[in-house]
Amino acid sequence: MLVKKVRELGEQEKLNSIVCSFDMRPLWKEMGITPELLMVGEERQERVKDEVDYLIECPFTESFRQKSAEDFIQEIIHDLFHAKYVVVGTDFTFGCEKRGDVRMLAEYADQYDYQLIVIEKERYRDRIISSTYVKEVVKDGDVGLAEKLLGYPFEVEGTVEH
């Protein structure tokens, strides 16, 4: 839903549509963490490439993690992207210790000349659709439901051992 809204705004306003996501792998590598992911960067790029003009994955390094919420708004949203619209989910957080949130984005919208659009979480049977929910249904063996929640075919990549 969020990507669709970004694409629609780009088309309507004759602007480049950009999705910015955070590539957590550099930080996880530093911390020695190997989380279960539904999709890694390359898969995300493949999935989104026809939907928007640009997918930018910011490497989430320790120095990026230390960036204040105010600096994130000024340096990333304003100076780097020159954003006219900022489209986020209701629980979007950013900046050091997740101090930035939707409320802060709204407070700075006039100062940095962007319009904030907040997308509500999608639900299925009164439950918020999340990566955790999708992982649960996959573990339960319900790939059909996983595909319904994702909105695209669920894929698994790996090596088959005999």
Sequence positions of predicted segments:
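Nucleotidyltransferase catalytic core that binds NTPs
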Residues: 1-162
